[in-house]
C-alpha cells in the first residue's frame, strides 16, 4: 500500500450537514476498498484562486490515506461523477 494525499473541493452552496454526508460517503468508499485513512482535515470554506463552475469559493477537504491503486481509482471514478465536488487532486505522498 502506498501513501496518498487527496484534496477535494465541495461546492459552497451546500449546507453543513450535506458537506458532512459527502465527506463520510467518500471516506466510506476508501475504507470499503481496504484503504486506511490516516487524517481527515476539513479546511472549511475558502476563496478559490479562480472561478470554477461559476463558484468563487469552495469547501476544502484534505485526506491522507494508505491505499492500493485500485482503491484510489475507484475513489477517483466516484468523486468525478458527483456534481457537488467541483475539483479533486490526488498525489502520491513520497516519504
Curated annotation (Swiss-Prot):
A GO-annotated cellular component? ribosome
Q: Name one GO biological process term.
A: translation
Record's function text: Binds together with bS18 to 16S ribosomal RNA.
Protein name (record): Small ribosomal subunit protein bS6
Keyword NADP recorded: no
Ribonucleoprotein keyword on record = yes
What keywords would UniProt list here? Ribonucleoprotein, Ribosomal protein, RNA-binding, rRNA-binding
Q: Which GO terms describe its molecular function?
A: small ribosomal subunit rRNA binding; structural constituent of ribosome
Identify the coding gene: rpsF
Report the family membership.
Belongs to the bacterial ribosomal protein bS6 family.
Amino acid at each position: 500500500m502506498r501513501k496518498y494525499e487527496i484534496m477535494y473541493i465541495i461546492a459552497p452552496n451546500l449546507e453543513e450537514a450535506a458537506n458532512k454526508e459527502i465527506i463520510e460517503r467518500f471516506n466510506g468508499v476508501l475504507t470499503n476498498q481496504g484503504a486506511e485513512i490516516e487524517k481527515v482535515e476539513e479546511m472549511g470554506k475558502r476563496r478559490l484562486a479562480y472561478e470554477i463552475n461559476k463558484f468563487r469559493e469552495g469547501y476544502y477537504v484534505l485526506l491522507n490515506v494508505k491505499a492500493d491503486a485500485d482503491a484510489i481509482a475507484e475513489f477517483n471514478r466516484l468523486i468525478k461523477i458527483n456534481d457537488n465536488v467541483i475539483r479533486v487532486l490526488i498525489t502520491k505522498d513520497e516519504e
